[in-house]
UniProtKB/Swiss-Prot annotation:
One Gene Ontology CC term in the entry: cytoplasm
Reactions it catalyzes: GTP + H2O = 7,8-dihydroneopterin 3'-triphosphate + formate + H(+)
EC code: 3.5.4.16
Organism: Leptospira interrogans serogroup Icterohaemorrhagiae serovar Lai (strain 56601)
Pfam families (UniProt xref): GTP_cyclohydroI
Residues the record lists as binding Zn(2+): 71, 74, 142
Protein name: GTP cyclohydrolase 1
Main EC class the enzyme belongs to: hydrolase
Amino acid sequence: MEEDVINILKSIGEDPTREGLLNTPKRVKKAYEFLTSGYRADITKIVNGAIFEEPTEGMVLVRDIEMYSLCEHHLLPFYGKAHVAYLPNKKIIGISKIPRIVDVFARRLQVQERLTEQIAYAIQEVLDPQGVAVVIKAKHLCMMMRGVEKQNSELFTSCMLGAFKENMVTRSEFLDLIRTGST
């Protein structure tokens, strides 16, 4: 990968041997290894048995999970917040595992639509809840820095499974909570 970065630098008219760029290929390689580490992550190891029997029936919501990813079309970042909820089915998951699941899928080349669904279906698979809801709000640098150059644009995506899809009251409660944060 380092040689590829050197070639990119040359192709845009830069001198990869100048002082400020000498370590750039190594830094870019390290950055991309981190930013794509989701390909090498295993959800089972992430969850690591942190699923607990619990008779609770109320909605569990982790709101404002900071996330960033790379647009698969331009390799430019998009970033924002994910809101993830589930309705337990006699089991709950350790709350830190939800942001970790978000990171697994965000640290891949992505489109936001697929990212949203992958998070929802992963939680559905490991927890088998009555329902899962995921909403992501993000800014895409590929729209802000190039192309249409709309700096204030935001993309919202959602995936509703089970009770969140079938029951409008449940869906409305979730949407109200992510809008206002009130209980």
